[in-house]
Amino acid sequence: MSLTVESTSFNLQYPIIKEFINTQLEKCYWTANEVKVEKDIHDVLVNLTPAERHGVFTTLKLFTLYEVRAGGDYWTGRFMREFKQHECQEMAAAFGMVELCIHKPFYNKINELLNISNAEFYTDYVKNPTLKARMESIDTIINHPNSLVSLACFSLVEGMVLYSNFAYLKHFQSNGKNKLLNINRGINY
């Protein structure tokens, strides 16, 4: 059975997809308020250099924007429209829910505590040609005419964007810095 054709049965056709869903919901589930990021605000505002603070602000801004693209535009948007098999629909709903209802609020919560969560903060990336190009490339990937190319490229970019930014935030726990402990707890989930 094709993943792009709606099934007339609710029998499990793709056990691996069901495993992905269960892992996401049972083993990786947490809430945005579970991690007490307010404990890291002092680190960001006082203990980081201006360059480090700029890097953290840029990372948090792009994470929040990216979660909207990943959860809304991709998983519950394109993927759900094109992959109609029941397990695919469930997976898209689960992945989209995590992006939109856990990750996005988690990053935005930090931004709110830093008093930077406003329209200007979330739109000024367009003034930076590199950041603007990065977000435009994500939109291009999501809207690629070939569904499989879109899926492959989106998965690759999601991994590269997330893990490179995770590495940046995690470096604040290395070499004796011991900063941003709670923000990194959210990443460790």
Whereabouts are the PLM-identified features?
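Non-heme di-metal
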Residues: M1-Y189
